[in-house]
């Protein structure tokens, strides 16, 4: 398995081959990539072609983790004004 951390435009910021279980971040977790703070947002799995075998395994895939900048995270998860009558 290979972790790829991507920004929202799809650019790969960092690649981590063969991560341990402890190195895989959970959702909405703050992480630092090259000194800049990001938040994990979503994860997708993409298999790549293993010429040796036709059986797909977890070692034959990328886990693409989309990360948000602090500003994007704040904009996405900011609390707006409450709905009228919701008090």
Curated annotation (Swiss-Prot):
Q: Which domain of life does the protein's organism represent?
A: Viruses
Identify this protein by name.
Uncharacterized 10.1 kDa protein in nrdA-td intergenic region
InterPro entries attached here? Answer: DUF5496
Stored Pfam families: DUF5496
Q: Which organism is it from?
A: Enterobacteria phage T4 (Bacteriophage T4)
